[in-house]
């Protein structure tokens, strides 16, 4: 009998809270993460976290112990898991909920917005709304800003149409598909979506924000240069949250060990990775475009981790105002809950310790499901059961 089960991804946050509450240990084996929300969600449900020390993962840990090992160190990870089995973590949920609530996150963002005076009209831009990790953050900010008496709007490029006040999908799905195709053919990304970008600029003009808060601009839904040139020409203050490294590399969301971005991209070792080019390497041209566009512009960068802030400081954006604000989650959902029914449903032996891993597309190279299965194999003679959530 296998000591693991691989389950499909789910957007049901109540179900995810049950998974987290059921587990004795949560593990993350991603190749690179900036500030993984799953680790935060697990701890808010009372479950300690271990994993690979890749990027900002260990910054998520509430427990002041070194519970992260080098990438690929399965022996070390197994020892960390067993160590967690032997200890009690009674206050971990309370501490995590205080630090990582969406209310705490919003308060810190508002303090950043309000330098030089309170900003009443805030416009948030992201690839998504509600339907992704960044989309959830944007929607939480929108909700809490409105609760604070401000006027907030969301402009997003991809996903379902959402019928709420000042929530606007400017992206045209057909144009997004064309953008993705042209990017693969030409090697350029963030250079197309002419009509979608015009729609976004028109909305900004109409809304007349006191401040724009940008999140992700990759994923084939906006033409970056004319958007930023418009914002600069209008002299609108900007806070920009970097959830990845895309805006200071030629094209990569995660540069991993590559240091080309510290001087000049080109001859990209990841040219066929997302965002993919089939034939042409245009990373030098895209790097120069971003450097010229952003280099002399005054705006505030927010990163969710100190690790990512340190990476920004090695790029051409090193002299910008850089603030660290941890991602927040909905602690009304993510808190310890009774998951006994789920344990029965999954047919997990009652006396087993349970190790959980959750990630979108968890079996992909970047999310590290294969390492979790190697950990399960390593611990097959232990009374431990592994649950992996996030298979496509």
Region spans (language model):
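Short hydrophobic beta-strand element within catalytic cores of glycosyltransferases
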Residues: 48-51
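A short helix/loop element that forms part of the nucleotide-sugar donor recognition site in Leloir-type
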Residues: 335-348
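Short alpha-helical donor nucleotide-sugar binding micro-motif in glycosyltransferases
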Residues: 18-23
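A charged, aromatic-enriched C-terminal amphipathic alpha-helix characteristic of glycosyltransferases
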Residues: 86-117
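Aromatic "clamp/platform" in nucleotide-sugar-dependent glycosyltransferases that forms part
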Residues: 31
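Conserved acidic donor-binding segment of nucleotide-sugar-dependent glycosyltransferases
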Residues: 63-74, 82-86
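Nucleotide-activated donor-binding/catalytic signature segment of Leloir-type glycosyltransferases, i.e.
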Residues: 1-10, 383-392
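Conserved donor-binding/catalytic core segment of Leloir-type glycosyltransferases
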Residues: 348-367, 373-376
């Amino acid at each position: 009998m296998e000591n693991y089960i691989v389950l499909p991804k789910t957007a049901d946050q109540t179900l995810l809270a049950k998974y987290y509450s059921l587990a004795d240990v949560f593990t993350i084996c991603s190749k690179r993460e900036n500030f993984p929300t799953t680790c935060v969600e697990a701890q808010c449900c009372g479950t300690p976290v271990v994993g690979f020390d890749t990027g900002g993962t260990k910054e998520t840990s509430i427990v002041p112990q070194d519970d992260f090992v080098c990438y690929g160190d399965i022996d070390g990870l197994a020892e960390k898991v067993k160590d967690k089995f032997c200890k009690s973590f009674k206050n971990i949920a309370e501490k995590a909920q205080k630090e990582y609530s969406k209310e705490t996150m919003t308060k810190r963002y508002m303090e950043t917005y309000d330098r030089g005076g309170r900003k009443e009209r805030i416009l948030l831009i992201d690839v998504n709304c509600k339907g992704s990790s960044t989309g959830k953050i944007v929607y939480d900010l929108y909700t809490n800003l409105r609760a604070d008496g401000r006027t907030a709007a969301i402009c997003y490029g991809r996903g379902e149409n959402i019928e709420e006040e000042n929530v606007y999908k400017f992206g045209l799905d057909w144009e997004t598909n064309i953008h993705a195709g042209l990017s693969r053919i030409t090697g350029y990304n963030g250079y197309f979506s002419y009509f979608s970008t015009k729609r976004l600029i028109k909305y900004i003009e109409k809304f007349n924000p006191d401040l724009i808060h940008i999140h992700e601009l990759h994923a084939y839904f906006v033409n970056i240069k004319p958007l930023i040139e418009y914002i600069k020409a209008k002299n609108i203050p900007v806070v920009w949250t970097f959830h990845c490294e895309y805006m200071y590399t030629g094209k990569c969301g995660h540069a991993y060990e590559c240091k080309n971005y510290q001087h000049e991209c080109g001859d990209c070792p990841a040219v066929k990775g997302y965002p993919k080019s089939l034939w042409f390497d245009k990373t030098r041209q895209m790097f120069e475009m971003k450097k010229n566009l952003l280099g002399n512009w005054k705006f505030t960068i927010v990163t969710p981790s100190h690790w990512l802030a340190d990476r920004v400081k090695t790029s051409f954006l090193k002299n910008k105002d850089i603030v660290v604000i941890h991602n927040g989650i909905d602690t009304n959902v993510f808190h310890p809950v009774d998951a006994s029914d789920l344990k029965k449903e999954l047919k997990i032996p009652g006396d087993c310790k349970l190790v959980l891993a959750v990630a979108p597309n968890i079996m992909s190279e970047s999310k590290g499901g294969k390492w979790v299965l190697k950990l399960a194999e390593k611990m097959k003679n232990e009374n431990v059961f592994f649950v992996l959530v996030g298979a496509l």
